[in-house]
Amino acid sequence: MILNEIFHECIKDLGGIVSVASTGTDGKPHIANTWNKYLIITEDEKILIPCFGFRKTEKNAETQPYVEIVVGSDKVQGKMGMGTGCLLSGTAKFEKDGALFNLVHDKLKFANRVLIFTPESCKQTI
């Protein structure tokens, strides 16, 4: 199991933010954001992120699928007080049809694609 208890506690805070960092072919980082409330976790621990924007992230993932994601909440006890987060590393791919897209689109009609994130690690940050 890669996704730890702190991760699951953080995403219960529906107002918490999610940041997705990707790298372009020019080597420059790009950050895109969404909300915890939109994440869907599959039984095999894939994280599904509904997308309407995320165009640059999608373009970056075509050539460099390795991304990092940060989730956080100020309502979860951290190592030094209230507030903590998790840094996740793994790979991303985008789909605009298929079973995982349909799962997301059935719940969130604005999604015209889904970012499918496969985590390789999940570490508490603070």
Question: Would you name each region that the model predicts?
Answer:
Residues 1-126:
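Binding-site signature for planar aromatic cofactors or substrates
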